[in-house]
Amino acid sequence: SSWSAEGDIAAQITAGILGRSPKSAVTIELVRTIFLLSVDHGPQVSGALNTIITARAGKGLVDSLAAGLMTIGPRFGGAVSDAAREWFDGVQQGLEPADLVETRAKAKQFIGGIGHKKYRLDLPDPRTTILAEYATRLDAHPYFDFAKGVEEITTQKKGNLILNVDGHIAALM
């Protein structure tokens, strides 16, 4: 990258997330990649659609953006936090991926970061392929390994119960 670390927004955001300067260029590159892969889903997703509808209804910029932001949730744009909690708790508690899947199935609960309406095993999300490559570049990736173990089980049940882009982001960060 031609940016210096001081002018690199990805490095600055990474430092803000970590609470310190990042030690690894790979970490900064991962954060930059996450932003690039997450920035635009087109006008058909709820956050974009509600922003457009609100603006066309005559509301101002702030109201329109707020309308879009209010639709971020577990089914669109907000699954990263739930997925991060799943992977972190699973690893910290020494669970096997099968334990998490069984617990959620018995409770009839979704697993954050698992599942997609469009993508499935035979039609993978190209963003997840790019993100998965980062796991091979990290010194350790226990959360990613745990999440992939969950995916291995869930995709045996249904092909679209893949580790989605939010699940990948959560597992890598």
Show the residue positions of the predicted features:
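Hydrophobic alpha-helical bundle cores within soluble ligand-binding/oligomerization subdomains
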Residues: 1-173
